[in-house]
């Protein structure tokens, strides 16, 4: 089978990279155990984070940062604030990908266990990521963070789930800003159709597209866009992941 043809559309002459010039204060805790197993899955829909290309450098975001799933896939560099805590490991920082939601806990005060309650900016990091910047026994530390471009290996991936008249497509391993803002789908016998966000980075179509090859347009929150032609062949199957040869 011929490799899919990929068209890259640059909407701006100088593509904007999602980089924050200034550091922003927040706090950070950890979850998921020393092997990070408890961080697999999550509210972004990426499933096994190793298979999805994200690994253990991941974090759940408080709702103030998560934005109902719109920030899934964003990358942040996080540094422990040594000016406020002796539990920090000086001179260290780590870049993580947002893969989950840290839900509010309104039974606790925001400064006494309800770390993810709005309007707090908080990262609940995988334990391996967290202990690279702070001492395990601390439990919670003050940090500074900034959003940075995502560096991913290989192409954008699409997992097609669902059933007839309901395609649920997970878009992942996305570079650049990392944050998918819009997805469109095209069957070989249809025009382009906008997909709607179902949850996290799962995008929904209600068209009947069986026996048609499928193409996708992926637009990031910085307005950059790629078109991936015929990534899924006409005999595609639900439950299958298709990997493109392009990324941002």
UniProtKB/Swiss-Prot annotation:
One of its GO terms (cellular component) is membrane. GO terms for biological process: plant-type cell wall loosening. Its main location: secreted. CDD domains: DPBB_EXPA_N. Residues 41-155 form the Expansin-like EG45 domain. Residues 165-244 form the Expansin-like CBD domain. Residues 1-21 form the signal peptide. It is found in: Secreted, Cell wall; Membrane. Keywords: Cell wall, Cell wall biogenesis/degradation, Membrane, Secreted, Signal. Pfam families: DPBB_1, Expansin_C. It is a peripheral membrane protein. May cause loosening and extension of plant cell walls by disrupting non-covalent bonding between cellulose microfibrils and matrix glucans. No enzymatic activity has been found. May be required for rapid internodal elongation in deepwater rice during submergence. Belongs to the expansin family. Expansin A subfamily. PANTHER family: EXPANSIN-A15 (PTHR31867). This is Expansin-A33. The gene is EXPA33.
